Amino acid sequence: MRLIFLGPPGAGKGTQAKHLTERYGIPQLSTGDMLRAAVAQATEVGKRAKAVMDAGQLVSDEIVNEIVSDRIDAPDCAKGFILDGYPRTVPQAVALDRMLEEKNLKLDAVIELKVDEAALVRRMENRVAETVAAGGTVRSDDNPEAFRRRLQEYREKTAPLSEHYARTGRLKTVDGMADVKTVTAEIEKILA
């Protein structure tokens, strides 16, 4: 099972991916985690990524695509994977399609969690309040202003992926505002 989760920050992608990882025994592939692992393991592409990051620049699509390609080849991805945070742009999606085709693999579904942005901001504020009340540490980007910037970036760069995958017939939409169990049940129906 090969999946992509789409949706803005705070939509519940990580929560749903964790459930599917446990249920189906497939890894959740986070771009950030893959990048850090490639750098730590000093792979060829990891060395190139490190040089770019050390120079204070953004890692190119070419390098990110290569890191994803290498990760998909890992033994734990034999039964499938869930991509989280990749692709972020239509050019990355096109590269992923080409990459999977070359490996004789296909995406089973692209699941978009549709959410109300104002409700997302409230959800984030509640999460911060609960974390603080429990004595936990709050992420630096978990404040309303930073969160709104992340939503704006999502709208500009990542939201066009919905149209791309809708054109290919692979996009499935789920109401991400429902409770976690309901969202999980809807995703399970799509995957059945």
Swiss-Prot record:
Chain spans, region NMP: 30-59
Main location: cytoplasm
PROSITE patterns: ADENYLATE_KINASE
Gene Ontology annotations of biological process type: AMP salvage
Compartments, as annotated in UniProt: Cytoplasm
CDD domains assigned to the protein according to its UniProt record, in alphabetical order: ADK (cd01428)
UniProt-listed HAMAP family: Adenylate_kinase_Adk
PANTHER family (alphabetical): NUCLEOTIDE KINASE (PTHR23359)
Name of protein: Adenylate kinase
